[in-house]
């Protein structure tokens, strides 16, 4: 069994954003915002979570300054903050 499904939703969502859009984030560099196109519904289906749960996390990360949420997209402002979320619950 893939251990990804056992991780908490924040770690899974952060990992998905970073993996799915890693090339764009790497090309932009750590201090340049990157806008990623996807809907919260698409993310919820990929992660097996409710759209509402995804929305709550994205809004929390937005308040913390890691991302900026817009219609069918998000802008990654602080990729390192997302990387830390992926590592937080590793054994």
Language model: regions and residue ranges:
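Polybasic "coupling" helices that flank or enter modular domains
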Residues: 1-46
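Beta-hairpin "wing" of winged helix-turn-helix
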Residues: 68-71
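Short, cationic-aromatic polyanion-contact patches
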Residues: 24-29, 39, 74-91
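Basic amphipathic alpha-helical segments that dock to polyanions
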Residues: 60-61
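Glycine-centered, phosphate/nucleic-acid-interacting loop/turn motifs that mediate DNA/RNA or nucleotide
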Residues: 65
């Amino acid at each position: 069994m893939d251990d990804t499904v056992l991780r908490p939703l924040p770690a899974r969502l952060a990992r998905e954003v970073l993996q799915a859009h890693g090339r764009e984030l790497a090309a932009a560099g750590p201090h340049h915002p990157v806008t990623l196109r996807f809907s919260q519904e698409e993310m919820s289906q990929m992660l097996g979570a409710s759209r509402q749960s995804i929305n709550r996390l994205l809004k929390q990360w937005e308040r913390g300054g890691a991302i900026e949420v817009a219609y069918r997209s998000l802008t990654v402002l602080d990729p390192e903050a997302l990387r830390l979320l992926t590592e937080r619950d590793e054994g």
